[in-house]
Amino acid sequence: MKLQVAIDLLSTEAALELAGKVAEYVDIIELGTPLIEAEGLSVITAVKKAHPDKIVFADMKTMDAGELEADIAFKAGADLVTVLGSADDSTIAGAVKAAQAHNKGVVVDLIGIEDKATRAQEVRALGAKFVEMHAGLDEQAKPGFDLNGLLAAGEKARVPFSVAGGVKVATIPAVQKAGAEVAVAGGAIYGAADPAAAAKELRAAIA
């Protein structure tokens, strides 16, 4: 199972600093939507230049103009881009077309989708590299939230998937048992007093 760090910071400088601290422990460096909105596509280029051996994941959350938005992110240096699962099938197919042209990949983010397992199967058929079983920060903040719903959807879907929704060391075994290909950790790393140590601990927890 791969480890992905989600960098939900707001400046290129801060993103590069965090990426530099944790790169040796992670496989995928995700640039969060607020970061890309704050700094533009140049942050993708900067991080890929600093870490050419890592998979750079641009969380574009594209909802329309799939081919165009994916193309500009790939040209900026992204290896993976996200399209929302609630987007029209033609939008996802357009992003996949751009990915094929660049030899890159599209991840379909299932945030806000009620029947994640069914939609996961549909978008995989459209050419998604994998799907992200994702609960956003707002959903995670609700009383009683846990990862079990995401893990169950992943197991049911039987397609390649990642899990994002407050993953931490204690939940890594469950994420791995569910069959996830990627565990996404954001706050567990960037919110830690020592992000490098936190990333190292997450890496060590992956069997």
Curated annotation (Swiss-Prot):
Its EC number is 4.1.2.43. It catalyses: D-ribulose 5-phosphate + formaldehyde = D-arabino-hex-3-ulose 6-phosphate. It holds the Pfam family OMPdecase. Coiled coil: none annotated. Pathway: One-carbon metabolism; formaldehyde assimilation via RuMP pathway; D-fructose 6-phosphate from D-ribulose 5-phosphate and formaldehyde: step 1/2. GO terms for biological process: 'de novo' pyrimidine nucleobase biosynthetic process; formaldehyde assimilation via ribulose monophosphate cycle; L-ascorbic acid catabolic process; one-carbon metabolic process. It comes from the Bacteria. CDD domains: KGPDC_HPS. Gene3D superfamilies: Aldolase class I. Induction: By methanol or methylamine. SUPFAM superfamilies: Ribulose-phoshate binding barrel. Keywords: Carbohydrate metabolism, Lyase, One-carbon metabolism. Transmembrane segments: none annotated. One of its GO terms (molecular function) is 3-dehydro-L-gulonate-6-phosphate decarboxylase activity. InterPro entries: 3-hexulose-6-phosphate_synth, Aldolase_TIM, HPS/KGPDC, OMPdeCOase_dom, RibuloseP-bd_barrel. Belongs to the HPS/KGPDC family. HPS subfamily. Catalyzes the condensation of ribulose 5-phosphate with formaldehyde to form 3-hexulose 6-phosphate. This is 3-hexulose-6-phosphate synthase.
